[in-house]
Amino acid sequence: MFKIYNNGNPIPMGYSQAVENNVQITNFALFSAAAIGVELCLFDEQNQETRLPMVRTENVWHLAVTGVKTGTEYAFRIHGEFANPQKLILDPYAKAVNGKPDLSSEESRSWFLLSDNRDNAHLAPRAVVISEEFDWENDTSPNTPWAETIVYELHVKGFSQLNEKIPAALRGTYTGLAHPVNLAYLKELGVTAVELLPVNFHINEPHLQARGLQNYWGYNPLAMFAVEPKYAATNNPLAEFKTMVKAFHKAGIEVILDVVFNHSAESEQTYPTFSQRGIDDQTYYWRNDQGRYINWTGCGNMLNLSSDVGRKWVVDCLRYWVEQCHIDGFRFDLATVLGRDTPDFNSSAQLFTDIKNEPSLQNIKLIAEPWDIGHYGYQVGNFPSYFAEWNDRFRDDLCRFWLWKSGEIGAFAERFAGSSDLFKKNDRLPHTTLNFITAHDGFTLKDLVSYNQKHNETNGEENRDGRNENYSYNHGVEGSTESLSEPQKSAVENNRTFAQSGLLMSLLLANGTPMLLAGDEFGNTQYGNNNAYCQDNEITWLKWANFNEELFELTKQTIALRKQIGSLNKDQWWSDENVQWLNIVGEPMTVEDWQNQQTKALQVVLDNRWLLLINAKAEGQMFHLPNRKWKPQIGTHNVTLEAQQAELSSMGFCMLNDE
């Protein structure tokens, strides 16, 4: 039986537990400036609801009760001018959630509308009180220096779902991801950090449910403190998640979470209400002068993180994941929203300062996706110096150089050298450019060299969704080469492999922090779908059965060599002292060389001992080398070395070193 113990405390937010006079006390606290009354709703094992009125201190409602134990479900009922106490409201600080709403039809959605006066307690998601006990043993973060970091972006389910080396019951789970087979694979590859697509509790949007689809990526969050349970092989997702993190740490691999603080799953104003909208709509969401939601995320709403409560919610959440789950870093989705305080972007926004000053976040890696779709939303290079940033200019300029005839060699060199035009300011170092060719959002590397057009028909939006400009090239045939006869089939496949190799080596040997999309190292495909957010199936799951061993070995060897090159692991901007840019005859690049639109080949000397031969032309290229004795290292499948000359017989990237 649940009983009021006393008025409780306004801090901390959410629930907290302590023992007083040999009695287990649970304190609940909820912010709502708009409410005129709040009821705490507790559910016993027979699903019987107990409603207890909460006490207000300024804008926080709180209450301490007895009788709460692990597994107890709770929610709130909000009273006020714009509230509806007939609807259960989820705690924004919920550490676990029981139930996902059915939004597949107009009728099912109507139960969650504030305008609907039916009680939805039997349908609404509820927070769950959980045990956070866990034996971390002597777990410590690998704390890999930024200059030595190689990020590997993956999806928890998709990584192991089709891997027959993993026990069937564990595939697609936290336990499956941390299976010794996977850890050994990642160690062999050489990556130092995994960046997990969202593992916070999320739900499927109404339009996807109506089509029988799911939000596979997970960028539709409902409870940012809660571990997503559908990736758990056990009935204790939090403990299983912690076990996974501990296993990664033992393997020397950091765990970075992709987090979504820019919007919530509540979408547009007329859509179902689950949490923040029902608590204090005016505080939690940005609105325009007409009172409508500002939708600069493309997801129906934009969270207001300039308010005290919004900033506190974010910092409290980050602290929870670090302290409870030993997380090593965060990648912030549509991170421009974090700096919107007017709501224009401000690189000195208070939230950035709060994050910087939070003690638990001092050694944590912070990565921004530095854009949204709003006013002045594109902010690449403008985040505080303690953030790294996804560099889409790197992606686009390298793809144009390798795959398009119009790609400029000067743009390639600028990106390859660390994008100093974007990041060399405010005492920032090269690691702050997080370089990538592909990510979850867009083509895979294999598809980038296999498709001229996106093929998103299975998403149900008549191929309207996804980026239209991918800077891709199919090398003569769209998609599969099965319809081709020899020798054309082999020619197309070889050219695609050469292009993938060139892009991979460019990524892994560029100045800055490289990020590799899971599966690119062995030629994974999504069959041309460049927006597979709703495909929880064979389209997105890694296809281990089609493993390209040659590509994997190249990737592994390139990563290993990167770790030997001082100019790439000292986090320093390149200068004439450690880099030389040479043309194909071995002479310093001239202004004319850089500006020549036909120039698609060059040589780069790093640290006066590593020679990179780069040829982005479809045909072969002869290079006159600097007068040294050079020894081939990697990318040598199409190189002939004789005296002071080297010939790449086709498109390619070759590394040599001074014997």
Swiss-Prot record:
Residues 456-468 have a biased composition (Basic and acidic residues). SMART domains: Aamy. GO terms for molecular function: glycogen debranching enzyme activity; hydrolase activity, hydrolyzing O-glycosyl compounds. The keyword Hydrolase applies. It is an enzyme of class 3 (hydrolase). The keyword Hydrolase applies. Residues 456-486 are annotated as: Disordered. Its EC number is 3.2.1.-. The active site is at 333 (nucleophile), 369 (proton donor). Keywords: Glycogen biosynthesis, Glycosidase, Hydrolase. Gene3D superfamilies: Glycosidases, Golgi alpha-mannosidase II, Immunoglobulins. One of its GO terms (biological process) is glycogen biosynthetic process. CDD domains: AmyAc_Glg_debranch, E_set_GDE_Isoamylase_N. Transmembrane segments: none annotated. The record marks 441 as: Transition state stabilizer. Belongs to the glycosyl hydrolase 13 family. NCBIfam families: glgX_debranch (TIGR02100). This is Glycogen operon protein GlgX homolog.
